[in-house]
Amino acid sequence: MAVVRRAVAARGLQMIAKPLTVVPGFDVWPGLLDISAQRALVEAVLAGAEQAPFSNYRTAYGKPMSVAMTALGSLGWTSDARGYRYVDRHPETGRPWPDMPPALLDLWTVLGDPETPPDSCLVNLYRDGARMGLHQDRDEADPRFPVLSISLGDTAVFRIGGVNRKDPTRSLRLASGDVCRLLGPARLAFHGVDRILPGSSSLVPGGGRINLTLRRARTA
């Protein structure tokens, strides 16, 4: 995982200094992670999934999600008839979540919050046909902490709006190696993934997109 740290140190600082601000509080660093760093992260995620398998959770209304999910870190997000929440063990295996790779902690220190580490990394696996409807990330205890998102694999058509569901939205493509951040006025903005572009990357075995989102779920 040192390759990710080198990517940040050697070629990330210039990009970090000049993000693309899509809307106030939503910044994108296109191509921040080089291909070696991307491969290292995919390898770490898939190794973690052997301990905490991907699952297609159901919404609180009983509908299965098209996106398969797991997590890294001390907490993972889950959904069922009881609602949406963070838990300290995989809901199916009962085992603790795998550790978060140090490289992700390094990225958070630079782009997230240098004083308070993340306690959860949600791992979303999008295969062909999967999507994520517009939603807010509001299950965390303190929204002052950002959400840091890393795209790996196939390009996603990402959509972001405002803090109200009916606010106008705009879409952009997030490619493998792109990193983005929701912070401040955009922290509770509605956002989602309309679709992925199958075959736009060969990074993820079997095709698809892996999205990593670093969060601070509980109060510091």
Swiss-Prot record:
Residues binding substrate: W77, Y84, R85, Y86, D139, R165
Coiled-coil features, chain-numbered ranges: none
Gene Ontology cellular component list: cytoplasm
Ranges of residues in domain Fe2OG dioxygenase: 117-218
Pfam families linked: 2OG-FeII_Oxy_2
Needed cofactors: Fe(2+)
Binding site for 2-oxoglutarate: N124, L125, Y126, R209, I210, N211, L212, T213, L214, R215
Cofactor binding notes: Binds 1 Fe(2+) ion per subunit.
Gene3D superfamilies in the cross-refs: Alpha-ketoglutarate-dependent dioxygenase AlkB-like
Taxonomy, superkingdom: Bacteria
EC number(s) from the headed UniProt entry: 1.14.11.33
Catalytic activity, as annotated: a methylated nucleobase within DNA + 2-oxoglutarate + O2 = a nucleobase within DNA + formaldehyde + succinate + CO2
Enzyme class: oxidoreductase
One Gene Ontology term of the molecular function aspect: broad specificity oxidative DNA demethylase activity
InterPro entries xref list: Alkb, AlkB-like, AlkB-like_sf, Oxoglu/Fe-dep_dioxygenase_dom
Residue positions binding Fe cation: H135, D137, H191
Keywords: Dioxygenase, DNA damage, DNA repair, Iron, Metal-binding, Oxidoreductase
A Gene Ontology BP annotation from the UniProt entry: DNA repair
Function of the protein: Dioxygenase that repairs alkylated DNA and RNA containing 3-methylcytosine or 1-methyladenine by oxidative demethylation. Has highest activity towards 3-methylcytosine. Has lower activity towards alkylated DNA containing ethenoadenine, and no detectable activity towards 1-methylguanine or 3-methylthymine. Accepts double-stranded and single-stranded substrates. Requires molecular oxygen, alpha-ketoglutarate and iron. Provides extensive resistance to alkylating agents such as MMS and DMS (SN2 agents), but not to MMNG and MNU (SN1 agents).
UniProt similarity note: Belongs to the alkB family.
This protein's name: Alpha-ketoglutarate-dependent dioxygenase AlkB homolog
Organism: Caulobacter vibrioides (strain NA1000 / CB15N)
Lineage, highest ranks first: Bacteria, Pseudomonadati, Pseudomonadota, Alphaproteobacteria, Caulobacterales
